[in-house]
Amino acid sequence: MSKYDAKQMSDTKHAEDQFERELQAAIDLIVQSKHPKKIVVAGPGAGKTSLFKKLLSKSKLANQDASHLVVTFISALAEELKHDLSELADVFTFHAHCKQLLHKNLYLREGLIEGFRVFPKLPSLIKRDWSLLNADDKDPPHFVNLMREAIDSDTTRFFIDRSNYYDAVSFDDMVFRVYLKLAAAPHAAERHELILVDEYQDFNLLEISLLDLLSRKSPIVVAGDDDQVLYGALRSSNWNFIRSCYSSPDCEACQLPFCLRCPEVVVNAFDDVVRAATAAGHLKGRIPKVYRYFPPSKGRDSAAHPKLHVIQTSIQKNGMGNYFGRVIAEVVLSIPAHYIKVSRDGGYPTVLIIGNKQYLTQVSAYLKERGYILDEKVDTEGEEDQIKREDGLKILKEDAGSSLGWRIMLEMDKPNFFTQAAARMLSTKPLVPMIPKAYRDGVSAEVQKFEEPPAKTKQPQPEFAKPTIKLTSFQSAKGLSAEYVFIVGLHDGDLPKSPNKINDIEVCKFLVALTRTRKQCYLLWTRRFAGVPKKPSMFLNWIDRSRKNSTYVDAKYLNEREKQGRPRTS
């Protein structure tokens, strides 16, 4: 080794040591702080789980019997956190934590039996009850929205009363029940030596109000990032909640400054998008934060993958015109074996394909035709709230006297005796004696024959040496990461939906998608989708040209690639 090479290695090591010290200083600041309420702003891949482990370990060291609670919103994240932290803390989604509290605490579940049933479709049924019991008001309230706003009113109390009638709960009302009871008697809250909250930006006003009550008896650390708010329309979360917490004099504000997941080009592209969005008048009120590339863990990946790949195709449709699918399949073949092994050992996808349904469906079809085993969610949009006959039969199979089960059957069949006397019947508990024997006998015979469909078999996994491939929407990409990320369908009209009226959530979707990347990111758009002309997303122009390699893919390009018989370099 020459003196020059030795000096260069020494300089690199010195620089990396500086980064390590800076990261450690940021972590120590949080871990050593004795402030009872801290907020940690941490961008994608900033190492929150590692921080949580240090906080919990310190508390356990001081008191081996310390009670710790970790909560998050996303089920997949809760499972990951359980894997890493279950020896140090109880880990739940917030809904699951509230369910546990209701089972344990008679005061909190007042009006419910201990063995209450969780029925996610309960709001749909109670809306029908409202219409039947309030003849002059046929438009039922948006119960869930009201509860998410922590509104205690006659309307939300109606929901709780009906929930008690059925001895059943759904997700939001579990939280609402606990909130109402603890708001009336804060001393009834459990005490923990430490509460940790992940993805704080995903929590709505109801959940944040309950967390505030819990924090009055227990030290709390909340972690999140206002660049990753994706669920506003779905569940009433809001940027303002995390921003208010960050600026509150009651909280100590901290940051994790580095991205430990992404290569340098992705972190720089993230910064480009934030700067461009801010300059265009978006992301107003954004928390100012440091988000930097971390050479000690990402230097090698950054050198191997210095550019984002922007793929423009001439067309995109099913069959041989499925250029998105063909490009992705070709790249997948080129993924190094050691990348596949690292992802399989780490339990995360080798490949993550993110986009809207119309593009994912076509890519999925192409990859399946070529024998790839895919991890993809079956589309059930609109079915989650739809009450089905099977719901009632299943409940009655388990409990023949269940008022909920019989109410579902009455809703399905709408027999004359019920529609003519619904108000009287729904005001009587239990419901069963109010139902004519002939109808009861008919339903009971149906229940007797009913066999619950077998549980879905676990999705098959590819051989260990093969890559795992997951397809997901922009919103469901939260909490995921992969060696290779493909973001498909980046057009004006898709993301953003309207380039002249960009929503901040659309910017956040793009930022979240980019930062799923551990090694290489591909950005795909087409000039014509299913015969309809398309224009590239303006978000692509927000990324500095120097960070992108661009390729135009048409029939000629693909034919030449096939003749050459070699995969695309990655």
Describe these PLM feature segments.
Residues I315-P436:
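Conserved helicase/translocase motor-coupling segment
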Residues L523-S570:
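Helicase C-terminal subdomain and adjacent C-terminal extension
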Residues I208-H305, V310, L540-K548:
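Conserved RecA-like helicase ATPase core segment
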Residues D11-V31, P36-P44, D250-F258, A279-V351:
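Inter-lobe coupling/hinge region of RecA-like P-loop helicase motors
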Residues K394-P533, M538-W542:
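Conserved helicase C-terminal RecA-like lobe
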Residues S2-A46, S50-L51, L112, F116-L196, ...:
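Accessory N-terminal region flanking or inserted into the helicase ATPase core
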Residues L196, Y200-N204, S209, D227-Q228, ...:
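Catalytic acidic motif of RecA-like/P-loop NTPases
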Residues M1-R109, T515:
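P-loop NTPase Walker
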